[in-house]
Structure formats: C-alpha cells, structure tokens
C-alpha cells in the first residue's frame, strides 16, 4: 500500500473513531410525545393538602422536583383553590372547563378552553373552577414545583 493510501486509510479510520466517540458521548435523544387530559395512561395523583378535595395532578413531562416540569391540574366543578404562590412562574393553557384566577393587585382573569395565562413567580393568587364540568389546566413550571400557602398553617 502506498503512503498516500495508508494516510487516507488512517484519516478515515480516525474520523470514524471520533464520530463513534462523539455519538457515544451524546445524551440519549428525548422522545416526542402528546397527551390529552382523557389519556387513560396518565397517572393522576393527589394534589398538595392546600388544594380542594377531588383535585388531581398528572405529570406530563419532566420531574416536578427539578426545573421545567409540565403537568395537568384537574379541579372538580365548583372547586376553589385558596390563596397561594409558587417559586416558579407558571405558563398555563386551560384544556377544559372555565376558570377564574385572581392575582394579588391585578384584574381577575377568566379562562375558557384554549386560553393561555401567565402567572408570575411568587405572586399570590387563588382560582375557582366556575363551570359545571371539571377544569383541567396545563401548567409548565420553570423551576421545581411547589405550592406555598399565603396563610400560615394552611
């Protein structure tokens, strides 16, 4: 084999090894997904004690103890959530029902299905499901999920 042929073979082999090493170092590709509130595979769990009876949460993506978790929050028809706040900002879309939200010092928000709402971090708020059907709210949290009551002991 000529020195040119040997050099070419070594370069191709080196590139293949570098490519294989880079691929092995890359994190696993996340899978795309879709979810609906009626998905039977959703695992609904209880809400924190502050929330009303019948409230349920389903984690859609991520880990609620870490940044960037997404969840569905389900409130029974007529249920109200007392004043509380979150360390994280919330980005929300109402999926079902009609919901009123009251953020301290701001005009009342009324959400219908498909409407987006933004809740600033640490801003106290309350909410009520004002429809005759349960309210389902998609929430994207920027940081770990928490619910802090504004009244101590709640």
Pin down the residues of each PLM region.
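Bacterial N-terminal signal peptides that target proteins for export
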Residues: 1-12
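Bacterial N-terminal signal peptides
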Residues: 11-20
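A short, N-terminal "cap"/entry segment at the start of jelly-roll beta-barrel domains
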Residues: 22-69, 152-154
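Double-stranded beta-helix
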Residues: 33-36, 126-154
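Conserved short histidine dyad/triad with adjacent acidic residue
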Residues: 69-86, 120-122
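Glycine- and acidic-residue-biased ligand/ion/polar-headgroup-sensing regions
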Residues: 76-79, 86-105
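Short beta-strand His + acidic residue motifs that chelate non-heme Fe in jelly-roll/DSBH
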Residues: 81-83, 101-102, 119, 124-130
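Short acidic-glycine-tyrosine-enriched beta hairpin
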Residues: 105-122
């Amino acid at each position: 084999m000529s020195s040119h042929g040997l050099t070419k073979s070594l370069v191709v082999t080196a590139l293949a090894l570098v490519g294989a090493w880079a691929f092995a170092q890359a994190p696993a590709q996340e899978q795309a997904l879709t979810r609906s509130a009626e998905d039977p595979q959703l695992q609904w769990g209880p809400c924190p004690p502050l929330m009303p009876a019948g409230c349920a949460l389903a984690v859609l993506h991520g880990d609620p103890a870490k940044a960037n978790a997404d969840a569905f929050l389900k409130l029974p028809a007529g249920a109200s959530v007392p004043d509380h706040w979150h360390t994280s900002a919330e980005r929300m879309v109402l999926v079902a029902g009609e919901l009123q939200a009251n953020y301290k010092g701001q005009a009342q928000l009324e959400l219908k299905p498909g409407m987006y709402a933004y809740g600033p971090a640490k801003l106290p708020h309350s909410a009520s499901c004002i429809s005759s059907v349960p309210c389902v709210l998609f929430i994207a949290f920027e940081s770990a999920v928490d619910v802090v009551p504004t009244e101590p002991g709640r």
